[in-house]
Amino acid sequence: MLDKEENIIKSNNSTSSNEKQHVDVTVESLENGDDFEEREIRDKAYKILKGHIDEAITPEESKRVRRKIDWRILPLITLVYGMNYVDKAALSWAVMFNLRKDINIDGNQYSWVSAIFYFGYLGAEYPANFIIHKFSVSKIICVVCLVWGVLLFGHLGVKNYAGLMVIRFILGVSEAPISAACINYIGEWYTKDEQPFRFLCFASGQGGLYIIFSLVAYGLGHVNDGSLYSWQYIFLVLACLSIILGTYMWFFLPTLPSEAKFLTEHERLIATKRVAGNMTGIKTIYWDNKQIIEAIKDPKTYFLVLYMFFSMIPNGGLTNFNTLVLSSFNFSKYETILVNLPWSFFSAGQMWVWAFFGIYFKNLRILGLTIPMIIAMIGLAIVYGTENGNADKWGRVFAYWMINSCSASFPYAMNMTGQLISGHTKQSFTNSAVLIAFAVGNIVGPFCFNASDAPKYTHALATIMGCFAACIVIGAGLGIYILWENKRRNKLYGNPEEDESLKLEGIIEGLKDKTDTENHHFRYVY
């Protein structure tokens, strides 16, 4: 299935004589002139690209190198991103096995326990993105995974509400870098056309690992040896696995394409040239405050932030309360865990469907932001509308599973920041804003579920319905805006997809750390 992605990659072998002349002039100005343009280039990858910018790479070379990259980094990123989700979901399993009773917390206190994680996440998000901008993304991913493991061990010592609040807050701080780090990391290794498939692959790891660890939690829930509570065993297993994974990645997760030891010198050049074509650069540590001002003025920032906020209100509520909502269908606590397994199939399965179509069709991103929300809205409408009726129990359960279709849009929402925004400072700032919206939405979500509404949580479901509708409108609005902007740029500056010299100019502007507004040859994907 990966091989067929080459239908997307365009060969750069043929250029017109005029285009070639323009290319030579550009390269000459970088290498043999007064080095004025070279001094403007901030990207760390330029060292390996110097002298090779105008050299074409064949689709066969690109495919061969991409395969090696896939096998090396995708399994590790999928595992770490899946563990990131399971760490949060573990709280809902722990509640099923009497966490609330054992440490004496009530329903409203549990809402605060769910939300406090995202207060830590919120406070740490901007510093986390600054650190990602300055340091090796791969090492940051390894370190935060190790820290998760230590903090999950800390859950075993929790004796009361205050202790749980403290450990969940610190866990939120430690997880703040992971989403932005994964976005940046994939952007450092893959072309724009390849990124959505990879995002969907590793994001599906959340659903996949959720299914696996739901079964693990089911088994651990039957352990009653007296040394630990059942819910403590869940945190113990996850802690050990997080530390093992973080340690392994420290040695085997590569940094940048230009520094990858598992590639030959020529393959490192190919890997770097592939990503340079994104016109976003690869790695720049220079911080430019002017780009922050531009991000604040950019309408795309507000589309992305609002979409993330409204999509995370359902996520924040359902991640922590889904087992409680499902138990209102009159299942036992063990049945609830098993019946909840298809909940993840509806997200992970849809991600793979979108990934499959993404191989054959370009520009599915806006559809990926809206269609999963429509499916989720239909499922929620059925659950909400049959609440007091005599509808078939399993029909309602199926509709409930449909609600998690909304999770299939999350990889697209995260990926859009890296693909619509150029300029490393602007991208870091926008990532921070989007992930702050992620945290705020997840904070708001649990408070939609009031204890007085249990077990059906009617008002919470109505709120979530409104959030799904808002996401559909915002996603469609973003698509209309970027289509209009692309047409405007093509009219004013020409189409870089039809003129190789314009495309090369755009690549060089990206290496200079120009923003998407400054780089007139940058085109938005949709």
Task: Please give the residue ranges for each predicted region.
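Helix-to-loop junctions at the C-terminal end of transmembrane segments
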Residues: 123-136, 349-364
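Intracellular terminal tails of multi-pass secondary transporters
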Residues: 1-83, 107, 250-285, 371, ...
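Short hydrophobic/alpha-helical segments at membrane-entry points of transmembrane helices
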Residues: 160-168, 180, 230, 303-304, ...
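Extracytoplasmic
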Residues: 72-107, 123, 128, 178, ...
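Conserved MFS/SLC helix-loop-helix module at the cytosolic interface between two early adjacent transmembrane helices
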Residues: 122-162
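Extracytoplasmic gate region of multi-pass secondary transporters
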Residues: 92, 290-355, 410, 414, ...
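Structural signature of the two symmetry-related core transmembrane helices
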Residues: 139-153, 367-382
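Glycine-rich segments within core transmembrane alpha-helices of 12-TM secondary carriers
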Residues: 196-228, 236-242, 431-445
